[in-house]
Each structure stands twice: as C-alpha cells, then as structure tokens.
Amino acid sequence: MSQHNILEALNVRVVGTGDRILFLAHGFGTDQSAWHLILPYFTQNYRVVLYDLVCAGSVNPDYFDFNRYTTLDPYVDDLLNIVDSLGIQNCAYVGHSVSAMIGIIASIRRPELFSKLILIGFSPRFLNDEDYHGGFEEGEIEKVFSAMEANYEAWVHGFAPLAVGADVPAAVREFSRTLFNMRPDISLFVSRTVFNSDLRGVLGLVRVPTCVIQTAKDVSVPASVAEYLRSHLGGDTTVETLKTEGHLPQLSAPAQLAQFLRRALPR
C-alpha cells in the first residue's frame, strides 16, 4: 500500500480537538471500534488517530498479502506510513496486544515520533522459554491453531469469554463480533505470526518513556511479564495494574482504563 491510499485502505480517522495527538491502536481480533467506549474521554483534549490493522475484518481482505505480513515489520511500516501521511511530528501511542508489539518496534525505528508509549496487555513473547514465563507451551499453542482451523466458529465461542475474563456479556459479544468479522484463514495466519514473535532482544533499545498497563488476571499475559518488561525496557518504565480481569479492559472496564490512561499520558 502506498502512502496515498493507506489512509483509505486502513480506515484511518482523526477525531477530536486539541494540539496533542493520541494514537489508539487495537489488538488482534478487534478493530478500531474496540475503542468506542474510551474515545469520549479524550476527544476534547486530543486529536485521536484511529486505524484498523490490515488483518482486521473491517479491512478489505484483498489488502492482506500473505507473502508480506509474515512478521510484525510490515505492520510497523503501515503505522509509520500513516504517521507520515498525516504529517504527524510527535504523538502519544496507546497500543493493545499486537499493537503494543508494533509500537515497540516503531519507537525503536523512529523514537522522535513518540512522546510516550502506553502498552495494554503487552507481551514480548507468548511462549515459555528456559528463563522466561510467557504463559504458553508450544504444544498448547499448536492445539489452539488446530482448533481455529477445525472449527473457527466453535473456537471463537470458547475463546472470546476466556479472553474477556471479566463477567461482562456485552464485551464478550463485541469481541466475538469482531473475531467473526475476520476471515478465518487470516485470523489463523496472524495468530501464528504473533505467537512466533519474540521481542525480548530489542526491549533494551526502547528509549521512549513507557507505561505498561495490565489487568489483575489476563489469560494471555501472566503478571510476571509486566515485571520482566519493567526490568528490560530501555526507557523509563512504569507498570500499572487495573482492578479488573481479562485481556480487553477497553471493552470490559473502559472507565477504569481511561482513568489510568489519563494518568499515564504526558502532561
């Protein structure tokens, strides 16, 4: 995608008023609508940039190139192309899940663009290693991939409530909706890319101040990961823990998350 058409292809929107720019970047299985409960808290003081990852169900699947999006780097290219197309010089960046990973790499490539990284449900690696607890064994992940491939609908019905964690049926419905919007083959392909990614080796290259936001219990990211990030990220790093459970607090506990985001954003 060229800079010219990426804004249209990835449904880029800029909403709100204010001098400061805030990026809200969604995670796997959702699209920019995942921020709809968060947005009202920030549109009076920020110009908020929203976009859809190329894998999102809200994007024309023809844009998803299976030969290109084999690592996180092309997603980073997309983000930086959006930033450049909009003429943004500096912004605060909120990234959820895979978009937290994307933000990390983008900040290493172009640190001058980012005043603050706020990473929600972020893990540099989901698989366990000898001296690292990512939360998943390789065999467990392969079973997940097999379930997605065998019966995507059944997998979504099982995974959505597990990921949301908190007892918020509306959040489960919303997450299920956006998961179902994804083409199953794209969903599986992206899952493999994310679970095969390992950013541990580059964390020390991050120089942008970072706030890691986790929930009290997240099926995708063990609590120990936040402490790992605190000690391995290269920039000033703080860790905040929400008094809620689940991987999608923007859907299940938006008021609480918005409060934490306000506190974390540069003054």
Curated annotation (Swiss-Prot):
GO cellular component, one term: cytoplasm
EC number(s) reported in the record: 3.1.-.-
Superkingdom assignment: Eukaryota
GO biological process entries: cellular response to strigolactone; secondary shoot formation; strigolactone biosynthetic process
Keyword Nucleus: yes
Residues at the catalytic site: 97 (nucleophile), 218, 247
Signal peptide location: none
KW Hydrolase (keyword) present: yes
Entry keywords, A to Z: Cytoplasm, Hydrolase, Nucleus
Recorded GO MF terms: hydrolase activity
Gene3D superfamilies with a match to the protein in the record: alpha/beta hydrolase (3.40.50.1820)
UniProt tissue specificity: Expressed at high levels in rosette and cauline leaves and at lower levels in axillary buds, inflorescences, stems, roots and developing vascular tissue of cotyledons.
Description of the deletion phenotype: Increased shoot branching. Accumulation of carlactone (CL), carlactonoate (CLA), methyl carlactonoate (MeCLA) and of their derivatives, including 3-hydroxycarlactone (3-HO-CL), 4-hydroxycarlactone (4-HO-CL) and 16-hydroxycarlactone (16-HO-CL). Corresponding hydroxycarlactonoates are also observed, such as 3-hydroxycarlactonoate (3-HO-CLA), 4-hydroxycarlactonoate (4-HO-CLA) and 16-hydroxycarlactonoate (16-HO-CLA), as well as methylated derivatives (11R)-hydroxymethyl carlactonoate (1'-HO-MeCLA), 4-hydroxymethyl carlactonoate (4-HO-MeCLA) and 16-hydroxymethyl carlactonoate (16-HO-MeCLA).
Record's subcellular location: Cytoplasm; Nucleus
Main location: cytoplasm
Induction: Not regulated by strigolactone, auxin signaling or bud growth status.
Family per record: Belongs to the AB hydrolase superfamily.
Record note on quaternary structure: Interacts with SMXL6, SMXL7 and SMXL8. The interaction with SMXLs occurs in the presence of (2'R) stereoisomers of strigolactones, but not (2'S) stereoisomers. Interacts with MAX2. Forms a complex with MAX2 and SKP1A/ASK1 in presence of strigolactone.
Additional facts recorded: The initial nucleophilic attack of strigolactones by D14 causes an electron shift, followed by the addition of a water molecule, to lead to the release of the ABC ring product and the formation of a S97-stabilized open lactone intermediate.
Function: Involved in strigolactone signaling pathway. Does not move long distances acropetally in the plant to regulate shoot branching and is rapidly degraded in the presence of strigolactones. Functions downstream of strigolactone synthesis, as a component of hormone signaling and as an enzyme that participates in the conversion of strigolactones to the bioactive form. Acts probably as a strigolactone receptor.
The name this protein goes by in its record: Strigolactone esterase D14
Species per Swiss-Prot/TrEMBL record: Arabidopsis thaliana
